[in-house]
Amino acid sequence: MRVLIATAQVPFVRGGAEMHAEGLQAALTAAGHQVEQVRLPFKWYPPERILDQILATRLLDVTESSGNRIDRVIGLKFPAYLVPHPSKVLWILHQFRQAYDFWGGEMDDLMQFPNGREVRDAVRSADQAFIPEARAVYANSQNVAARLKRFCGIDAAPLYHPPPGAELFRSAPAEDFLYLPSRVNPTKRQLLVVEALALCREPVRVRFSGPVDDAGYERAIGDRVRELGLGDRVDRLGPAEETAKREHYARCLGVVYPPVDEDYGYVTLESMLASKPVITCSDSVGSLEFVRDGETGLVAEPTAEALAGAMDRLWGDRAQAARWGASGRELYDRRDITWQRVVATLTRDA
């Protein structure tokens, strides 16, 4: 089958969505399909640019290439998933969230514009009109599926995939640190972990790694670490190469991961692959699809006090932490989170 993966990317910005698309391309190729990935450059400012991109996507013809039919289109991200094709299947990573759950909140950068509401309504109308064109609609997590249903009235089945290099993760004896590998961004709430660390009764240490998305937030974290006198209990490693990151996973006592309203997030799955328990928050959403309180980790309220209590509990009972980590790995294996399953689902006749 000749398959085209349709996605979007902000030029020179690389994250989980890009790794997701590459993983899908590799899995389809390994299954014997001929695959091409098309990434539309995405720019969301000024807001009217979004309308131009919706129109441009709808005008694309991807039914054939050089006279050869394209058998299947798999759409991943807005606005690329709006491209018309008679045999299109959607595997939605996320919609344009500023038009949905981010609207009117701290993460909203659309409402401030005079035409923001008009653009929001146009995005919603396009999704509601054109997503149902697909033969089948899947989401990369239950959270994304629930958001699609809530705002657009569209049903989507969650279809899970493994993180990059899943087969390379291992577990090692736990050392004296908790690990938080994630982009430095307010939505990942590293600052909340710092505040919690200051309230811990146990001598908890936290190791942070990840690229900086928000330089101001990175400075705020450093300032707060100094103000609270936590310099000897916080390691800020910056971006970590994949091999080094897997080694941190292998040797940590557990992973603390408190993002706000996460869609999927590789961190939880990577922790499970390394047989490490996860501390997350009750509003982290995506991680809650895998973190079961008192079974594979701990779920705390998103306050410094509650998070500190969870960190203390994990730190103070190493045997329990190991049992929760092993349970997480067993849960991952039972879920059959494999690329083979993904490929079979996305290429079957709908």
Segments and roles (model prediction):
Residues D108, F113-V137, A145:
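Membrane-proximal helix-turn-helix segments that form the acceptor-binding/catalytic region
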Residues F169-K188, V194-R201, R207:
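Conserved donor-binding/catalytic core segment of Leloir-type glycosyltransferases
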Residues R205-G222, G238:
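Glycosyltransferase donor-sugar binding loop
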Residues G216-E218, G231-E241, H248, L298:
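Active-site donor-binding acidic/aromatic loop of nucleotide-activated sugar
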Residues V260:
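Aromatic "clamp/platform" in nucleotide-sugar-dependent glycosyltransferases that forms part
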Residues P277-C281:
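Short hydrophobic beta-strand element within catalytic cores of glycosyltransferases
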Residues D293-E305, R313-R318:
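Conserved acidic donor-binding segment of nucleotide-sugar-dependent glycosyltransferases
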Residues A306, R313, Q320-R335:
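A short, well-ordered alpha-helix in the C-terminal region of glycosyltransferases
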